[in-house]
UniProtKB/Swiss-Prot annotation:
Keyword Magnesium listed: no
Official protein name in the record: Matrix protein
MF (Gene Ontology): lipid binding; structural constituent of virion
Entry function: The M protein has a crucial role in virus assembly and interacts with the RNP complex as well as with the viral membrane. Associates with phosphatidylserine (PS) and phosphatidylinositol 4,5-bisphosphate (PIP2) at the plasma membrane. Interaction with PIP2 triggers matrix protein lattice polymerization. Matrix proteins induce host membrane deformation and curvature necessary for virion assembly/budding.
Listed GO biological process terms: virion assembly
Lineage: Viruses, Riboviria, Orthornavirae, Negarnaviricota, Haploviricotina
One GO location term (cellular component): host cell plasma membrane
Top-level taxon of the source organism: Viruses
Quaternary structure (record): Homodimer. Dimerization is critical for virion formation. Interacts with host ANP32B.
Major site of localization recorded for this protein: virion
Keyword set, alphabetical order: Host cell membrane, Host membrane, Host-virus interaction, Lipid-binding, Membrane, Viral envelope protein, Viral matrix protein, Virion
Amino acid sequence: MTEIYDFDKSAWDIKGSIAPTQPTTHSEGRLVPQVRVIDPGPGDRKDECLMYMSLLGVVEDSDPLGPPIGRAFGSPPLGVGRSTAKPEELLKEATELDIVVRRTAGLNEKLVFYNNTPLTLPTPWRKVPTTGSVFNANQVCNAVNLTPLDTPQRFRVVYTSITRLSDNGHYTVPRRMLEFRSVNAVAFNLLATLRIDKAIGHGKIIDNAEQLPEATFMVHIGNFRRKKSEVYSADHCKMEIEKMGLVFALGGIGGTSPHIRSTGKMSKTLHAQLGFKKTLCYPLMDINEDLNRLLWRSRCKIARIQAVLQPSVPQEFRIYDDVIINDDQGLFKALQTVVPSNA
């Protein structure tokens, strides 16, 4: 049985939107570099805030003899750093990087990024570009299938996205708890609806936000579980959620990221599941990579957030990684697989 409750829009009115990156071009047709700065927090950090930086650009042929052929868009994250440099200075330095791209494979297709030029301003982010980084290709590239192996590839930075982490605390991505399942527990999930302006280009912005197309994603927050064998009622869970005083915002961690802050009282069990943190971040890069790629340059705004209460998936259910095939007596048998939609 699934129960759904709507949050009031005041919970995301202040920082529940991200401005678009509108492309402009030089006279010869090349994109003009731009920087986008996002601050999803309340700004209560007293010292200089940390910044999370991502790059967005074009994967193209590295051919010095002819005009480069663009193959795909890419967006590798550089991670968190502390810097007093202006965003425009960081953008200029990023566009001067000579980043090599190589396609490879492991459990899934990968893209390797590494830089061949010395870094000056982006020193806090030195490790990722200089030592090289390997990413799940579908998380950082919109068309890895078009990236050739027989032609050297480079990554030309066009945009940078900077997310100021101005909260007086720590952001936590509770990865270890996202697949946690428990008997007689109620899973607390959030279903978020975004309005997206997918039209990119001059004069194509839709003024009426109500007309924008919508997309949804779901994140798992935690489980409500009693010590006894009984299960909490949906009304009790709703009361616990209301006590938490949740506030929502959109940031740019790993592309686009919902940020959740609890301003009220949280149950001890749920607080422990979240690592005793009240400021959470769920990068869409990990949750919904297809939607994340769509939002790389788009304007988006939270239209609706709902609390979804569902029974926790039984531990006996097998997930995709547990598929077993045996050929005893010449017969192939695959165990029935259930992919849980919540933890």
